[in-house]
Amino acid sequence: MKLDHVIESQQFTVPLLMELFDRTRQMERMVARGGTRDYADKIMASLFYEPSTRTRFSFEAAMYRLGGRVLSTEHARVFSSEIDVERLEDTIRIISSFSDVIVLRPTEEGGARRAARVSRVPVINAGDGSSGQHPTQALLDLYTIYRERRSLDGLTIAIVGELDGGRTARSLAYLLSKFERVKIHFVSPPELQMRPDILAHLDEHDVWYDMLHDVDPIAGDVDVIYQTRIRPDRVSDRAALSRYTINARLLRKMKPDAMILHPLPRTVEIDKDVDDDPRALYFKQAANGLVVRMALLTLLWDRE
């Protein structure tokens, strides 16, 4: 399967995911040796219309580790051309004429797809809109689980937090639907539940799921808790915040080999005391972003 752009999680088949994960292991070994110069002729344009630290730095570090070069901004909206309201499509046409890949975080949902339609080079969606997708985050999330378990079939996972507009949770749910016997618990305040389009997709692919308002009852049953942010000002019942947070009490209920993941940044939803628990893998998860994105870049270029 040819991969021209990375816009949404639905693009990835299981064979393509396994190929990506094999490449990621190769990238781990390559980084341990100090990187490579194999892609020294490549230029990545890092075009962010919204602020980013982890995603932007991860992509740029990936490019440098591959020997390539980076053109970067996280302030595209305030550049002079953008003050004059230059159309996104015009910007992409120009930037794609002197780069080999564009990593794009647009302000609006669907912006990455619009960019891909006019770009001469691969476009990678680095998170579009407040309720769109973040496919490369989901890829590194899935790789982290796969690397620990060696399988994704039969996984039971709780996805917890603000799910109504969580693009990382949305992208991960799409990827999980590709595997056998997966069970997903969506845990959120009633007003922040996962949106119907994701649930319809899971129904269509016969994926088991339920929707809960407390992580406590299923903490001992899950292989993974994928915790996302939970902002107190978005929860109508502040007293109920503990139902969606991870602390020492919840750790005692979890399996000894369970995993705690978080796309970061966190606020109140994971106590800092949890960081030292061996099941807390969110910093390792973030570090995996480097090698997954290295693998993804090579996958795009090597298939050209």
Which residue ranges define each predicted feature?
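C-terminal helix-to-coil terminal segments
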Residues: 276-304
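A short helix->loop->beta-strand "cap" motif at the edges of active sites that frequently abuts
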Residues: 121, 180-182, 253-259
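Active-site cofactor/substrate anionic-group-binding motifs, chiefly glycine-
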Residues: 43, 48-98
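Glycine-rich phosphate/diphosphate-binding loop of Rossmann-like nucleotide-binding domains
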Residues: 49-62, 147-227
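Rossmann-like adenosine-cofactor binding region
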Residues: 202-280
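Anion-binding alpha/beta catalytic cores of soluble intermediary-metabolism enzymes, centered on
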Residues: 84, 93, 100-175, 262
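Positively charged, low-complexity intrinsically disordered leader regions
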Residues: 1-57, 61
